[in-house]
Structure formats: C-alpha cells, structure tokens
C-alpha cells in the first residue's frame, strides 16, 4: 500500500470506519496511538483483531515518523438501503467534495521499504471485511457511473495542473476489468496498485472507462453493512474504543438483536422503518437524525451536502450481484421485526428523515417515513389565559368584607412622594389616557391610597368586584420611590439644571381594557377622546366600587339610595323640578341679615376618592315673594367657562362661575311670569382641586370648535372669599383656600375632534418640573409650564391645598 511517493490516506476502510464515515449522521475519528509492530490483518482470531487494526491505522496515518495527526471529522446526511429494485435506478449518484489534496489526507513522511509480505498484504488486503481477497484483481461487482467526468471529476479537471500525480487515475481503467464505484473520489487500491500510475506511457494507453474504480470494497448495500456489523461483535467493541462519534455517551451499546432493516411491503400505505446502526460502546452520536451538523435536510429535488458527501439526482446503478450472506442477514433482520420485505419505490435519502421520530431504544435510531407528502401543520400559538375582568357582585367577592373594612380605616396621606418617572407606551390613540394617568400618579394622596391597598393573587381572589381599583393599585406599584434631594435654592422661573433618569416605559394595557369592561362611551369608535371626560370616568368608577364595598358594612335597614356620580350643577330646571317634587333631605337655613332659605342636599356617602377630589357647590335660586331655594351639589372638577372675551385668567373664570345669573321666561303654576336669579358659590373646597377650562364649544349647527385663547393660570392660586358660600366664609382660613399647581394637562392642535395630549408634572425629588409626552420624559423649568402657545393650550389644571403639603 505504501509507495516511495506521497500516498493518499483515503484508501481502504474497515467496516467500522465505513459506518462512521458514511452511515452515521455525524462522525469523528480519534486515531489510535502509533504502534511500532506490524502484524498483517488476515483471517485471525478476534483476540488479534484489535492489534491488527491498531497497526493498520498507525501505519496509514502516522507512517514511520509516528507524528500525531489532527482530529478529522466526516459525515453524511442520509442513508439509503440497497435493494434489487434499485439496481438500475437512474435517480441518484454519489460524489464527494472532500479535497484529497488537503494536508490531512496526504502522508508527508517517507514510507518504509516494502517487503514481500507487505506487498502481498497490501495488494490483497480488504479493509472492509478485514480479510485477504483471493485475487488482487477485484470481482465483477461494482457500481457504474454514467459519466466519468461528471460530479466532482468535472469540477476537479478545471484545476488539473494543481493536482499530484495519479490524482485523475480513478477516471481511467482497463476496459476488460470491471471497476467499482468511487468512494470520496479515490480509486480502488486493490485494482490499481498493480498498475503504476507514475508511468505516463502506461497511463496514456489505458482507455477511459464508463465506470470508475473505487478506493475500498465498501458494502454494496446497507444490508451488507449490517451483516458485517453483526459479525465479530466482540472484536468490534475493542476496536471502536478509540473511534468516537460526536454526541453519544460512552455507556451506549448496541446488541445484534436490536439492529434491523425493515423495508415496507405495503407500498405507499405503510411507513418504512429503517434501523440506522449506531456506533458501539465508546462512541458518540447525534440524537436528531433530521438535522446534520446544524443544517436541516433539504427537499429531494435539491442536492444534499454533508461533510463532503454530495447527493446528485443523476444516473446511478448498484451492483447486480448480491452476496448470500447479505440475503440471509436481511431475512433474519426482517424476521426479527415481523415485517416482510418488498421492493419499495425509489426515493431520495432526504425523504427518509422528513418525519423522523426518536426511538425508545437508546441503541438503535429508527426513522419512520410515509410515501405520502408530509403536511406541515401550522403552529398554533399558545392561548394565553386571560384573567376575567368582568366585575362580579360584591357578594361573590371573597375579600369584599376585608376590603370594605380596610377602606373604612384608611387615612389619607398628603406627604409628597418622590417617584422615579416612567413614560407610558402609546400603541393606539391613548394619549388622553396616558396624560391623565401621569397627573394622577403625581398626586400624593392618590398614590398613597392605592399603595395602602394590598395586591391579591389569583388564588386569594379568583374573582373581583373592583376591577378599576385593582388596575390602579397595579398602576401605582409600577412606580418606585426615589430619594428626595436637598431642596435647591431656586427662584420662580429659574432654569433647572439638575437631570433625572427615568425608568423604563411600559404600556398599561390593563388600564385601557377598563373602557371595554365598563362599556364606557369613550370606547365607542370615532368618538371624541376627551381627557376631562376620562378623568370623570375614572373618579366616578373608583367612587362607585368603594361605595359598593362600604354598603356591606351598613345594617340592612340603613341601606339608603345613594347618588353615586357627583355631577356639576345642571341648571334651574332641575332645581324647579326638585321644588315641585320635594325632598326629604331639605332644611331651612337662616343666612345673613336674617334671610332664610330652604336647602336641599343630594344623598351622598363619602369615600376616599371624594375625600381627595370631592367638593360641594351651593346653587341658590332667588324668586320674588318666595324663600330662597339652595341645593348642594358635589363635584370632582370645576367646569370653568372661558368663552367670554372678558375672561383672560383663571381668577376671571372663577368669578364668572359665581356671578349672579338671571333666568328669563320662567312661569309659576299660575302661568304668571316672574323673574328668577341663580347664583353658584363654593360650599366646600377639596384637598385636590381640578379646574377644567372648557375649550370645546358646541355650535347651534351641531358642530364643535376649540377655543384657542391663552388663559393665564398661576402656580399658587388663592380662592377669594367672594367665591365661598355666605355660611362658610368665616370658617375657611386662608391656608385652606390657597392651592399650588402640581400638574397640567395640555391639548395640542387646533381641532376639537382630534389633537394630542401631554402632561407637565411637579417632581418633588427634582424640586422641578417634568414634561411627559407618552414615552418621552424630560426636565423643564417652571416658566415653560405657565407659558402657553397657540399649538399647546392648558386644558386641565391640578392644584393641591398648601395646608396639606
């Protein structure tokens, strides 16, 4: 086998090498250490087999020098069983893209001189069967290649000048000597060693054959390979201790009874179970045969490449002779599986792995395939379990009583809290919601109230009667405290130099869903999105949920009708209606100068929400020859009309609110027209005062326009005594009617049916102002807060009482 010139390693393979190189999906070979002694591998006992193979590898790989060679990896993608029905099939051929000129395939060291015994062993030794052949001339079995220059041969001829001597000898052969199929692009040494390829004259006389010789006498079909694998199993265990395949644990072993090759006998209706022989103990193998070296197997129409083996849909044929050992082995394997053998239709190697399933046995991997085209079912995303947010009655709420008791004992905390600001992601038209939420988060009593309510798990509270409270408790818990910095000396309007690091923005989808849970009119498509209306929706919703809980603590006989929605004073018609119908909650009140009036108050129960935002207005109707009629009406926001040209500031709008109003055309029961006057005053001021500048005016034609005018508003607002009701003027001190601005909601744009909302909030930790536009958070100075432009106008003003700061 060795010659004075450089010799190619890719010559002869033992049966275990062939399985590792061409059967296993991914193989590696660790060559054994160099051995100085040489014993020819002939028909010997299994005890000597390991030493013989040991030396054979050492001689071929190491040579005389005994130098270590690097770890070499080989592999294929698919395995095809040989069957007599595929003898003349022209669908497939095998070629190689391994480069035999690579350094790891060429022996650079000189070989030792041949002896007569060595020459005999080299010429007649069969590395696959580990035995000596009867003749140096190969037998008549072989696979013919339809085109000797096709595949890799055609590509390699383009670089013929760069190839070593004898490289193209596998394309030539003696016409009367049958040649064998190429294995990795090398000629069979048993057939070519007798012919010197170094003699150019002799090489020119050799005609080019239609078939190409192959390097080693590899099995002609897969059954032969299994037959050889089953024989001499005990010897194989010792030989393969040094040959390991990547991925298989060392303790994995294969028994002969578990290896089977079972072709289908039912045509396309039955699946084909193919046993892919795994390496014996001490080997590694990949678990997923459907993927080779990180690449998914391609469709049969495309060429498949894996570690140097290329599968082309070209003309190919198998040997016509089948050994008797192969037939007997195949029948034995079929008997073990309980399935009869038949001629399966020709299919590509890749099709065997399209529906691969893992085997229950760790030793043999089975691949089950049907001839019908594989239908890939679309991946259905996992259905996420959504928490049912539809409110249930308080009687079905397991923690309703506990919740109600907590609300009874809660005490409002007005201490400022420094929170790390976070933007809100807006993936829809939610700017009016995001702007309102940022203002509520900046309200200390609102934040402390929600933080005092515990967060219940789904197990503790499988259903809820307070989805709105739960959502706002969750919202406040999204924000974390930030240490309060020392108070900086800053004059009003001075530029803030400090910087702040906001937290990561988030999307409060649970808040957005409340609109559909309560079927609010704000969720109607195409409806005007109004920040003030949304604020009323929130405050009324929270108030009603707390009210329902508080009812649980009242005795059954004390249940009374409760007005759940504080609304602004509607008008004189409602007052007159109440006068006609009468009310149980009315009393006569003597005012200044001994003037008496009948006062009516709607039934109203306090909740923590009303304790923060709730105030009362007193509406008095003056009529000739009658006592004054007064009505107390709760409110969450003060509606300020700014349409008049005289109104330029917030103070002007407040004075206009309490101005006396005359009503024309009012008649009594006797159909007599009388003059009526109406005046509204502030009876009770809330801790948090929200002023609504009514910029959207409805026209007689039914349209709506935005009032684009600048209304000046101060940072510190003092409510004049003239705005208070006569009975409370002396009771409310200056500190209780002085407020400080902490949030402003702006409306951007000139249209009343569109636009954008942003918010400016006061940050106690920064001791300055932040401008929040959905996800954007930036520091601004106080001058930018009170300054308005045509494009951006103030819409909602949030004030806190200074005596509670």
Swiss-Prot record:
Region Disordered, annotated ranges: 136-173, 284-305, 573-600
Alphabetized GO MF terms: cysteine-type deubiquitinase activity; cysteine-type endopeptidase activity; p53 binding; transmembrane transporter binding
Signal peptide: none
A biological process term (GO) from this entry: protein deubiquitination
Annotated Polar residues bias: 143-153, 284-298
Pfam families registered for this protein in UniProt: UCH
Places the protein is found: Cytoplasm; Nucleus
Principal place of residence: cytoplasm
Catalyzed chemical reaction(s): Thiol-dependent hydrolysis of ester, thioester, amide, peptide and isopeptide bonds formed by the C-terminal Gly of ubiquitin (a 76-residue protein attached to proteins as an intracellular targeting signal)
SUPFAM superfamilies referenced in this protein's UniProt entry, alphabetically: Cysteine proteinases (SSF54001)
Segments forming domain USP: 422-802
Family according to the record: Belongs to the peptidase C19 family. USP10 subfamily.
Name of protein: Ubiquitin carboxyl-terminal hydrolase 10-B
Lineage summary: Eukaryota, Metazoa, Chordata, Craniata, Vertebrata
């Amino acid at each position: 086998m060795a010659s004075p010139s450089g010799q190619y390693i890719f010559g002869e393979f033992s049966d275990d090498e062939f399985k590792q190189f061409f059967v296993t999906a991914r193989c590696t070979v660790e060559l054994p250490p160099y051995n100085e002694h040489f014993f020819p591998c002939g028909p010997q006992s299994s005890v000597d087999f390991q030493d013989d193979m040991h030396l054979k590898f050492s001689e071929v790989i190491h040579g005389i020098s005994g130098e270590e060679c690097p770890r070499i990896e080989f592999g294929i993608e698919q395995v095809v069983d040989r069957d007599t029905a595929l003898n003349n099939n022209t669908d497939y051929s095998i070629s190689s893209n391994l480069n035999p000129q690579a350094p790891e395939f060429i022996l650079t060291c000189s070989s030792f001189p041949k002896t007569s015994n060595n020459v005999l062993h080299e010429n007649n030794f069969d590395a696959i069967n580990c035995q000596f052949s009867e003749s140096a001339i190969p037998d008549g079995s072989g696979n013919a290649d339809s085109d000797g220059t096709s595949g890799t041969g055609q590509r390699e001829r383009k670089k013929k000048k760069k190839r070593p001597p004898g490289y193209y000898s596998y394309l030539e052969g003696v016409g009367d000597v049958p040649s064998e199929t190429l294995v990795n692009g090398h000629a069979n040494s048993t057939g070519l060693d007798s012919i010197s390829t170094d003699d150019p004259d002799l090489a020119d006389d050799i005609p080019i054959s239609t078939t190409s010789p192959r390097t080693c006498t590899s099995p002609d079909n897969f059954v032969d390979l299994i037959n050889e694998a089953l024989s001499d199993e005990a010897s194989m265990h010792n030989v393969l201790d040094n040959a390991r395949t990547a991925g298989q644990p060392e303790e994995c072993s294969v028994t002969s009874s578990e290896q089977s090759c079972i072709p289908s006998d039912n045509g396309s209706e039955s699946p084909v179970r193919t046993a892919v022989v795994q390496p014996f103990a001490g080997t590694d193998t990949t678990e997923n045969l459907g993927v080779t070296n990180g690449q998914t197997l391609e469709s049969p129409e495309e060429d498949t490449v894996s570690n140097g083996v290329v599968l082309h849909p070209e003309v190919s044929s198998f040997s016509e002779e089948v050994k008797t050992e192969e037939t007997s082995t195949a029948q034995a394997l079929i008997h073990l599986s309980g399935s009869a053998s038949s001629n399966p239709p020709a299919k590509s190697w890749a099709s065997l792995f399209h529906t691969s399933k893992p085997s229950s046995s760790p030793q043999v991997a089975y691949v089950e395939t049907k001839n019908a085209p594989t239908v890939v079912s679309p991946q259905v995303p996992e259905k996420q379990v959504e928490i049912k947010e539809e409110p249930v009655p308080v009687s079905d709420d397991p923690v309703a009583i506990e919740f109600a008791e907590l609300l009874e004992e809660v005490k409002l905390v007005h201490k400022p809290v420094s929170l790390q600001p976070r933007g809100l992601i807006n993936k829809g038209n939610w700017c009016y919601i995001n702007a309102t939420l940022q203002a509520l988060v900046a309200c200390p009593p609102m934040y402390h109230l929600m933080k005092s309510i515990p967060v219940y798990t789904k197990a503790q509270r499988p259903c809820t009667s307070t989805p709105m409270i739960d959502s706002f408790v969750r919202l406040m818990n999204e924000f974390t405290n930030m240490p309060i910095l020392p108070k900086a000396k800053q004059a009003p309007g001075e530029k803030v130099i400090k910087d702040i690091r906001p937290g990561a923005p988030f999307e409060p989808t649970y808040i957005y869903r409340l609109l559909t849970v309560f079927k609010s009119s704000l969720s109607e498509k195409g409806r005007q999105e109004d920040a003030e209306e949304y604020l009323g929706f929130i405050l009324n919703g929270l108030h009603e949920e707390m009210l329902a809980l508080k009812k649980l603590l009242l005795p059954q006989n004390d249940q009374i009708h409760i007005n759940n929605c504080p609304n602004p004073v509607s008008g004189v018609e409602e007052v007159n209606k109440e006068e006609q119908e009468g009310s149980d909650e009315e009393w006569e009140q003597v005012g200044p100068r001994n003037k008496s009036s009948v006062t009516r108050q709607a039934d109203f129960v306090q909740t923590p929400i009303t304790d923060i935002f709730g105030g009362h207005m007193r509406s008095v109707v003056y009529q000739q020859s009658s006592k004054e009629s007064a009505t107390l009406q709760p409110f969450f926001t003060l509606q300020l009309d700014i349409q008049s040209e005289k109104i330029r500031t917030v103070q002007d709008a407040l004075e206009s609110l309490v101005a006396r109003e005359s009503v024309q055309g009012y008649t009594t029961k006797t159909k007599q027209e009388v003059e009526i006057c109406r005046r509204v005053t502030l009876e009770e001021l809330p801790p948090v005062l929200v002023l609504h500048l009514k910029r959207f005016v409805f026209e007689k034609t039914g349209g709506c326009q935005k009032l684009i005018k600048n209304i000046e508003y101060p940072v510190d607002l003092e409510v004049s005594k003239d705005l208070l009701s006569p009975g409370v003027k002396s009771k409310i001190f200056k500190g209780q009617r002085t407020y400080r601005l902490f949030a402003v909601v702006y409306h951007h744009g000139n249209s009343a049916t569109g636009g954008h909302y942003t918010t400016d909030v006061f940050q106690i930790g920064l001791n300055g102002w932040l401008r929040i536009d959905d996800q954007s958070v930036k520091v601004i100075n106080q001058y930018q807060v009170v300054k308005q432009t045509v494009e951006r106008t103030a819409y909602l003003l949030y004030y806190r009482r200074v005596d509670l700061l």
